[in-house]
Amino acid sequence: MKHAKQTRAPWILLACLAAIALCIVAAVTLLQPNTNPKNIEIPGTRGNIPATIQLPAKSARGEELPLVVLCHGFTGNRQGDGHFAPMAEDLVTHGIATVRLDFAGCGDSTEPYANYTLANMAADVDSVIGYMQATYGTGKTALVGHSMGGRLASLYPQLGQYPVTALALWSPANGTGLQGLEFLSIDNFAAVEELAARADAEGSVAAWGVELSAAYIDGMRDSDPNAALQERGLPVLLTYSGNERILSDTTQTETKAAVESLPDGQVVLEPFVNGDHNYTSEDPATNTQLDADLRQVTVDFLTSHLQ
């Protein structure tokens, strides 16, 4: 009997060592800094939505997994002029998940651009938030929107079905009504009004190499994003560059005033005086600094309200 016990002892020791090794492997896995971005298709109301998600490592998550939805601008895509991917990397280190999507007719979307409307964009944001909640248990949610994506983000608390905690607006096209389309002909607003009239009469109109539907024009005409911001009173970060060009001084002034009137509104301009509407520059060093500053300001704002 003593001999049998001696035979089993080494196996018991090996089993214990193996269990310890598995625990170490599991711990190391949890301590990985973040997961890689993953391209997926999210079911939407009109078909699948091309999207990229990025989740923090489990060790970086709190009890609730915050979410940021990144919304690109007119004729843009989910790369966000090169800013979205690195910002998603920044956010996961703070335990915040992200999803960035291509709206109708943009990026990898197979829909016609005629489906690009404010209502459809809000529905797509509904779909991705719902998917992230159901699949990953996300909680507090913020939106980041650039240009037309900023207008959408401003309006989403009115148009969407999910509550949001905060909004970050990069150079939003927030002119009232059709003024939000001023970028189509910044020096001649009468031309914008003419395009809108043609869309109303013909069902759509070509501009900037895409087909704009009457539904898109109607949504723009009927919306007032700055009034929506003031009505909801959410925490809002607003940035504009020093060389917007396609957004009028009036739009910028009115939007700044709207955000500054909010209890927790923040306007940041100085770091971006040398940038264009997309927060880029032909000078490589300036371009790099613009991206770094835009991400830093935005991440600081988001973490302060989501954690």
Language model features with spans:
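The alpha/beta-hydrolase serine catalytic core
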Residues: 49, 151, 158, 163-301, ...
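Alpha/beta-hydrolase fold nucleophile elbow
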Residues: 136-147
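Conserved alpha/beta-hydrolase
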Residues: 88-110
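Catalytic nucleophile-loop/oxyanion-hole region of alpha/beta-hydrolase
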Residues: 78-80, 106-138, 288-289
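Active-site glycine-rich loops that stabilize anionic/oxyanionic intermediates
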Residues: 65, 72-77
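Glycine-rich nucleophile elbow surrounding the catalytic serine of serine-hydrolase chemistry
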Residues: 145-155
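N-terminal cap/lid segment of alpha/beta-hydrolase-fold proteins
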Residues: 28-61
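The serine-hydrolase catalytic nucleophile loop
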Residues: 76-88, 103, 250-251
